Amino acid sequence: MSQSFPRNDTSSSSEDETDNYRSHIQIPSLDLANYRKQQKSTSKTNLAKAGKKLKNNKSVRFPDSYSPRDTIISNASTTNNSSSDSELEQDMVTGENSNLPNFNFSANQVHSPEYANEDDANDDSGEEEDTFEPPADFYASEGSDEDMEADNEGDNVEDKEEVVNEKEEIADDLHSKSSKTSRESKSFNAGTKNSRRSLNSLQRNETDVTDQLKRTTSTTSSSKRSNSDKRTGFKDILRKFALVDQQYPEAPSNRESEDLGEPQPSRSDTFLGNVLSMAGESGGLVPGATHFSREKTIDEEEEVGFEDEDSDLIEMKKLDFAQLSNEAQNLISTHVPDLANKLPEGTSSDQQLDYSDTSASNLIKNDEETGNEATKKDDEFYTPNPDYFIRGDINNENDADDYLMLDEHMDDIAPPKRVQAGVLSSLLKLYQNPQEQQSSSSLTSKSTYGGNTLADDSNYSYSDPKAASTLDFTKLKNDFKNGPKRMANKIPGRKHGAQKQDTQDESAQKYYDEDGNEIAAPNLPSFHNAKPKAPKKIAAAGKVPSKVHKKLKEHKRQQDQQLRITVHIADILHRQRFIMRMCKALMMFGAPTHRLEEYMTLTSRVLEIDGQFVYFPGCMIVSFGDASTRTSEVHLVRCAQGLNLSKLSDTHRIYKGVIHDILPVDEASTQLEELLKKKNRYSPWLCVFLYGLGSSMVCPFAFNGGWYDVPIAFGVGLCVGYLQFFVSSKSNLYSSVFEVTASIVVTFIARAIGSIHDGEYFCFSAIAQGSLALILPGYIILTGSLELQSRNIVAGSVRMFYAIIYSLFLGFGITLGASLYGWVDSNAISTTKCKNSIKQDEFKILFVPLFSACLGLINQARWRQLPIMIVIACAGYVGTFFAGKHKQFSEVTEFTACIGAFIVGILGNLYSRIGKGMAVAAMLPAIFVQVPSGIASQSTLLAGVESADKLTSSNSTTTDTSTASDSAGSLAFGATMVKVSIGISVGLFASALFVYPFGKKKTGLFSL
């Protein structure tokens, strides 16, 4: 006997459905056994027989109310059913609920919105019996998809009316269809209604799918209707309930179907898709879990797991199981709140209830087991990166990218999510109690020794002062109590038994307070397990019992664990040592100091070391952290900063190899050690000769020296080179006053030679300035300007100020040297302009390549590095020379230096960008050329000669004007150095902006 459900008009029912809507949908369990027995007599049609051939494709009735109406629909659990049919129904229902996360609602298969609106209109009209058509391959005996598409021509509305009229005659328990035509005419205009409202009407008015199929096929067989009429009546029914994602044609096959506007269902418009969308979940739960093909559509109800023998046939892609587990948990809690309330406390996405063998929880479990087995040994030596959860500077690490000039090489290597565990935490793992088998996470929660934290021990002492008292009366009572037993142990015949009993008494020892009441044992931590234990002797394998064999196996596992931890500690120490050696090498060989912190950070990221770096001039503070124990190890890397272009190139090559995982750390450490121990390319005596050659080459083009001044400058330059390479290197005390003493010696000799024949043959200013050109602070100015550009204010300000003070030292030495010779010779010359300078400018530029080559060789550059250095230096000098020829620019030192530095920066950036070389090494000689040229334009290096003349003159009377001029003359050289520094800095900034307008530099100017 069929069950009927009364309903009102469509308009009124839709309003009631909206009012009675509940946000949490409960899907009750269904008892279909009795209902099937009642309908067994009427299910003899061909369509029912075809339905029986399907395996486990039993339909499920969805009630039109959340509360049970009769005994057929019950909220009781399906496990209480006794019949075999009910058990099959139970498996199917629970299987559907458990497999909800495995359905795919692919976003790229969703059709146009007008189709979805038409589906909603059909749902709202209440035509649950005849507005759906089954897919063509749902029943194998019904024909192919091409036949169905060919038979779909005709008036679909009239077919639907005939089907409804026949259902009214046969099924008396169904609802009255008097308003069928009016509701059907309204169905196409209801597309703009709320989808949730249409879903409620669909859920409240659904009947058993199998019942509809049986009664509809019986009417069609009696009236001998065509196959097209039958397929048209059921296609829309089951495509709303089909659990299989079918591929429908994207457009109607003919013009008649286009006129009818037959909607093609999207995967999100199926019944289960609408139910899932009501729970706040968008789309499907497992996108891309199944594959589709137009040639052959698979019945996924059979493949997903409704048959025991075919439970693993679904083809899955790589999924995010944690996210799917959370979605499945939300669905269960939304649709089955009773079951969700029975979940144990602390259930997470990793611990799902085992609903069926094909549920997503099994997939998560299997994936986690395989992943844990593969990475179990590696995970114990890793800790989370403190940059994510302690320091919180991951989002702020690229703030420097706001400045266009900065190198964005930091973005190439992201900070790792996990870093290598520190040395201290690894040592704690090595010496902790192996029997407890606690993981490394126990270091943050519970103490390894004793099982209690220090806070628990301190709380115990405060809560129970009697137990923490220093006067332990319980020991005295126990001595009296156990005294006879201990005396009995001394009997010769009871030695073994007494020892055993004594150990049992000690293990079962009780503690009492002063009143004699028994109290708990004092909760004191034990450190006896922290000592390393000697391995026990292992007997032969054939004579070992099973229990002893297990102990030996456990002992071997512990030994393997200790070996792994020991190797890990050695590896961590090796990596940390490599980082400090790399830092020392970069500082010693003259790497750009403004990049040291970033390069050290990149190296630590690649090596998975938690390292923090802070640079100060002459010192690098290195901190290696241990996130497990919240400790850090701080090192100070201090070294005398020098300049060695060849070794700097080798260090850069080693650094690049480690960064790009081309060179292992062991081999890189060995190469660094060899590089640090390696001798310089050129001997000190050769460098002294190059000093003299460079001094002679700079004299003509920078300080307007004559041909006679070249050999004199060569000899004086040899003296300066000898003082620097031999005297200063052997005496730390003299190295502090090297600049002053060198300037004194050079000025004294130059004034003595220039005074011959009143300066007719030799130029005093050219000889003095040319000999001091190689010790001018050109490199200090370059590094200081780069640090200021990179917003490293501390180091940049210190270097720039040091360059100014260094220049004042030189000026003071020049004044003192000139005064010393003035006291010796009263006829000493004081002119600062040369009479016999080279007039042809074409000859002056020939000395620039030679001076650049001497600078490169003095700084230990390779011969193959000299060509690019010479080209850049010559181009920069040409710009400075012609800028100085202009009348308006001749007196503006900072502008001429800016033009020269701009040209040098452009060529250096282009060389770095095209040739992938070191821009700083190529630019360094060119910057050295710019500094003497800028100083010579003002002739401020000899500004102290006027003060020297006043010191040696007989007139001791001075005025305020002369005092002011003296003070201005003494500071003139420092002011000139400031102007040159500003011009060089601005020129380098502008050149970087010109070559890298978007700020992206892989091996640009400010990288190595």
UniProtKB/Swiss-Prot annotation:
The keyword Transport does not apply. It is a multi-pass membrane protein. Residues 1-273, 342-384, 477-506 are annotated as: Disordered. Residues 116-132, 143-161 have a biased composition (Acidic residues). Pfam families: ThrE, ThrE_2. Its main location: membrane. The chain crosses the membrane at residues 683-703, 707-727, 736-756, 762-782, 800-820, 838-858, 866-886, 892-912, 917-937, 978-998. The keyword Ligase does not apply. Residues 95-111, 188-204, 346-364 have a biased composition (Polar residues). Keywords: Membrane, Transmembrane, Transmembrane helix. Residues 70-85, 215-225 have a biased composition (Low complexity). Residues 162-186, 205-214, 226-239 have a biased composition (Basic and acidic residues). Residues 483-498 have a biased composition (Basic residues). It is found in: Membrane. Belongs to the ThrE exporter (TC 2.A.79) family. This is Pheromone-regulated membrane protein 10. It comes from Debaryomyces hansenii (strain ATCC 36239 / CBS 767 / BCRC 21394 / JCM 1990 / NBRC 0083 / IGC 2968) (Yeast).
